[in-house]
Amino acid sequence: MAYLRSLSMISPLSLNFYGIMVLGLSVILSLIGLLGLYSAANGQFDIWAEKQGIMVLILFFIVIAFSFININVFYCYAYHIYAVTLVLLVVAEILGYTAMGAQRWLRFGFVNIQPSELMKIGLILALARYFHATKFTEIKTWKGIIFPIFLTLVPVALVLKQPNLGTATILLLVSGAIFFIAGVKIYKFALVLGGVIITGPICWNFLHDYQKQRIMTFLNPESDHLGAGYNIIQSQVAVGAGGIYGQGLLQGSQNQLDFLPEKHTDFIFTLLAEECGFIGVVLILALYMLLISMCWLISRNSNALASRIIAAGIASLLFVHIFINIGMISRSEEHTSELQSLRHIS
């Protein structure tokens, strides 16, 4: 049990400070997300903001409750949590309902659950437990990373089956960050990347038509400005219309005239960019970077590898979501409907 006692993350004083910072920043970003939903509904709470507000309140109390649970508990049950989320992915494949072209949702009463989102946490916990319990000399060998690769590829394959290319990509990127933190040699990443590049043309043939269309549209949205390229073009127009100071809450022309697509989900950050302007966007990104920094500080000050991986894994998860979402808006990354919006990240 000695290894369990070694899992305390950092000193109580530092943990309280970082914990309060993480919670406070999460609340602020959640409120900004609710404000965006309020604006997306043309000044009404009862369409999207009210439901999201209830979920934020529930999750707030869940987070408070979880803060009293010793991290050893999550370590001990890491594989169990992973197994449950994996089973939910399989159940979603069999009994789940389809939304936006993919079978990825489960209904539990009035609550809809997306198992692939739960898997992000389950995978982080499972990898943290494995690498913590494995000798560093073994991690540096190919044999030592076979099992964590298996832990990663099984849910990735199930998520791709839905199909949900965006979430599968996120799982791979976050897992890659965890492998690096755990001490896996750089040359192994290079070999994997080389394999991906070589097999890229083959993988293209296995993509769904709508996924190929998104990639081609991203490269040249003007080729179909009224069809597949409409979302990207309107998003860029909205961002540009925001200028330095923004057009003001409920004053965004793209938003109020309903030119902005999916403004309550995938393009909510575009809505905020139009109404809050460049200054507002910088402030929001600063809050996100501060939140990620707090997670990294928790990781760096942790005494055990499992604690470092859990904190760094969550930081990586946030960063990947933000990078892809902002990249989609600025057309520096391909947009997929699977990627979560600002309100989901917050």
What are the language-model segments listed below?
Residues 1-15:
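Short, Lys/Arg-rich, polar N-terminal cytosolic tail immediately upstream
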Residues 12-21, 79-87, 237-245:
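Alpha-helical transmembrane segments of integral membrane proteins, especially early/N-terminal helices
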Residues 39, 252, 344-346:
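Conserved protein kinase catalytic core
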Residues 23-231, 270-330:
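Hydrophobic alpha-helical transmembrane segments of multi-pass inner membrane proteins, especially
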Residues 334-346:
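Single conserved hydrophobic/aromatic residue that forms the stacking wall/gate
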Residues 132, 245, 333:
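Nucleotide phosphate-binding site architecture
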Residues 217, 221-265, 276-280:
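TM-adjacent membrane-interface loops and short helices in multi-pass inner/ER membrane proteins
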